Amino acid sequence: MAKEQQVQANDLQEKLIAVNRVSKTVKGGRIMSFTALTVVGDGNGRVGFGYGKAREVPAAIQKAMEKARRNMTTIALNEGTLHHPVKGRHSGSKVYMQPAAEGTGVIAGGAMRAVLEVAGVHNVLSKAYGSTNPINIVRATIDALGSMKSPEMVAAKRGLTVEAISE
């Protein structure tokens, strides 16, 4: 169910997280179609996800990749890890991520791992709570990464220097 595939396209890493067969029941029977969940990132703090649906698997994956490229957000990273611990939630899924020392690697499962890898996070400790639905985990992970603030952002917001807030 949760297949992963990585493709390089114009400096973007693309990962296929899940393909699912769905059906619509009509008067004459069932109409089968497929959904695909993908994430795209540049490995340097830009990441996006897409969800596509079509009658054939390749078409669903293509739609999902296009949506992911259009839906990219920028994340402030700190030398391949996070600036501080963050929490994110979407629907019934909750995620917790914290920075890790160099050499730790990406300690995350399934859909969360795919998002972190394409975003360019190399060292992180993470845990998913509640629902492990891949779509909700991806949304919760991107929500958590988007809520992360770099010291420069905090300093600018407070009108201070980075040195002043780090004391």
From Swiss-Prot:
Q: Where does the S5 DRBM domain start and stop, copy by copy?
A: 12-75
GO molecular-function terms, A-Z = rRNA binding; structural constituent of ribosome
The UniProt keywords, alphabetically, are: Ribonucleoprotein, Ribosomal protein, RNA-binding, rRNA-binding
A GO biological process of this protein is: translation
The source's domain of life comes to: Bacteria
Record's keyword annotation contains RNA-binding: yes
Q: What residue range is the signal peptide?
A: none
> Might you report a single GO cellular component term?
small ribosomal subunit
Q: Which PROSITE patterns is this protein grouped with?
A: RIBOSOMAL_S5, S5_DSRBD
Q: Which SUPFAM superfamilies match?
A: dsRNA-binding domain-like, Ribosomal protein S5 domain 2-like
Its job: With S4 and S12 plays an important role in translational accuracy.
What's said on domains?
Answer: The N-terminal domain interacts with the head of the 30S subunit; the C-terminal domain interacts with the body and contacts protein S4. The interaction surface between S4 and S5 is involved in control of translational fidelity.
Record PANTHER family: MITOCHONDRIAL RIBOSOMAL PROTEIN S5 (PTHR48277:SF1)
Assigned protein family: Belongs to the universal ribosomal protein uS5 family.
Extract the HAMAP family matched here: Ribosomal_uS5_B
What's the subunit arrangement here? Part of the 30S ribosomal subunit. Contacts proteins S4 and S8.
> What is the protein named?
Small ribosomal subunit protein uS5
